[in-house]
Amino acid sequence: MKKYFTSAFWGLCFIIFTILVKVIDVQALGAEGSLIGFAGLNTAVFKLLGTNHFAYLATQLFGVLAILVAAVFAVLGFLQLLKRKSLLKVDREILMAGIVYALVIILYVLFEKLAINYRPVVLDEGLEASYPSTHTMLILTILGTAIPLAGKYIKNPKLALAVKLICILIMCLTVIFRLISGVHWFTDIIGGVLISLCLIRLYKALL
């Protein structure tokens, strides 16, 4: 069970931080008077950074890219299943990635329904739940698990390294751009990073 310790640690950090978001400095300072935790900190960061439409569009594109990456490994796993005629014979790295991707989907839907914090701005779909940043969670988790997968399935070392570096770059840009885009509070991003670390470490523990 030691191999799950790091994942459990980040998961616990996420739970504790979420509780703090619900109870510390909760004020009706959000969009349409919605309640937000860490109100002083969140509103100060939002006023400092404002909104950035380019950053928002970039993270939307990163999200599509992450889904395509997940789809590539899903297709690879399906082809292995057809060829080897047994789910147990599909590479463990791909099977475990599938489990983590399933968890991402479940958590994505769950957090969209649980309104812990609302967005600082109202988008086309009206007032939306914003904690944690599920966009950040999706991109970081998928690309974070893609890094070891790239090392295994891309035979050209230079190409594999390039793909890994691109994944890391996009992960970093996602955190920065999602924050400066203005569609999330600062604590939303922190929550998204914490749950991503939990899922990425879980994937490594499952291998």
Features from the language model and the residues they span:
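Hydrophobic, lipid-facing residues on alpha-helical transmembrane segments of integral membrane proteins
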Residues: 8, 12-16, 95-110, 141-145, ...
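Membrane-helix interfacial "entry" motifs
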Residues: 52-59, 85, 89, 93, ...
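Alpha-helical membrane-inserting segments
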Residues: 17, 45-46, 78, 107, ...
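N-terminal transmembrane-helix/juxtamembrane module of multi-pass inner/ER membrane proteins
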Residues: 1-69, 112-123
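Lipid-exposed faces of alpha-helical membrane segments in multi-pass integral membrane proteins
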Residues: 12, 65-75, 99, 103-107, ...
